[in-house]
Curated annotation (Swiss-Prot):
Entry keyword set: Cell membrane, FAD, Flavoprotein, Glycoprotein, GPI-anchor, Lipoprotein, Membrane, Oxidoreductase, Pigment, Signal
Keyword Nucleotide-binding appears in the UniProt entry: no
Name of the protein in its database record: FAD-dependent oxidoreductase pigF
Protein's gene: pigF
Intracellular or extracellular location(s): Cell membrane
Membrane topology, as annotated: Lipid-anchor; GPI-anchor
Single Gene Ontology MF annotation: oxidoreductase activity
Propeptide feature ranges: 445-465
Amino acid sequence: MMLLTLLILSSVGLAAAADPSLFSENDYSPDNIVNRDVLIVGGGAAGTHAAVRLKDLGKSFTLVEKSSVLGGHTHTYIDPTTGTPVEFGVHSFGNTSDTRDFFARFEIPLVDFVPARFPVHYIDFNTGDAVAVALDTNVTGYLDQVEKYPSLAYGWLTSFPVPSDLLLSFGDFVNKYSLQKIVYTIYYLGVGIGNILQQLTITVMNSVGVGILSGLQGVPGGAVVPAAGNNHAIFDKALAELRADILLNSHVVAASRPANNSGVKVVVQTPNSRKLVLAKRIIVAVLTQPENMNVFSPDEREARLFSQLKGQAFYVGLVTNTGLPVNQSYYNAASSEPDNVPLLPKTYNIQSTVLPGVFWWLYGSETALTEAAVKTAVTSQIATVRRALNVPAPAGSPQFLAFGNHTPTHVTVPAEAIASGFYRDLYGLQGYRNTWYTGAQFIDSASGIWNLTNAVVLPGLLTGL
């Protein structure tokens, strides 16, 4: 029986409990012991917003972020010559009260998002064939289906059992509702999902929802951006204000999370020292895959859920010296597929930006790749596009100005797990062992995450704090 139990726990990735001696206050100097109401793990859109809200609510916190900046998937390149900001991560934010309030908090005015329009060439990035994509932007039929599930706008699967349509592969869903004409449109709106026809319909709808579709249909005000440009400015301002309570280039080493509401102890490695954070609550604002959560010594209930999450590899960046004609964009389209949707691995598109000659690219893979491997693949497909257009190669190789790694993205679980109540159980972890959760595994948009934090996470976390 003991062997069977060990095998079961191993299969769900249950981590061993941390050495209790790690949490002894006697082993830390006074300046390396931090007492706070809340420890926040992750400084992306979710964690940064939670930190600002806690400060405004009069609660103390420490935020731990593994990189040197806040902002997560929001990347802005500033041209060194002109000072022009170029977005190569998050391009816009849903126009919700949560978004408007967050930007207003830092006195950043917003305007409607108007995407740049450049002539588009549809090319098979593998063969170099020009592809006649019959792009249909009339997504009314799909929108009618999405609107049946309003809770998906915030990642909340409040109905149970889960409707069977949501558990169909998107390919089967398309066939059921005769949506073949708009497959390529949904594909390019949902870049990063991966092989879209093989994904579950619920995954696609969670990414390509009412907000994105409203913008496509010409509804003004569906998305907003800072009036001065630079989507990353809000995170820069947040860092400047909260710097004393943020540990950058740092990571959690171990955590003690008793189930009796007696508070938590978390060991954090910073560039200069190891700190012991004593807190009443934890907000986990990173993906709860085992590689992130094993340091928190998940129990069987938690590990069973965390071990099931899988995501796609996704990379973004800016490149110049491509030899491609400027002020035009190039979309990958499979010449051999009836819906023209290419399979992974692939460069999704190579798009012009506001800087002439600088292109924004997006690359996806089913497995994680090194930065060098991604750049090699993108360079190869740039050459294929150039040959398709019959334009000469430039002197030298493409120059990569910026690179962002969004791996893993669009994390999800199999249909069987969802049907068995996976998301019900995942939401059921809110508050368990003094730990609360927010972030992209619930909803893949900043505005949706901020709503989740404001409406669900903070009210529960603040009770009794």
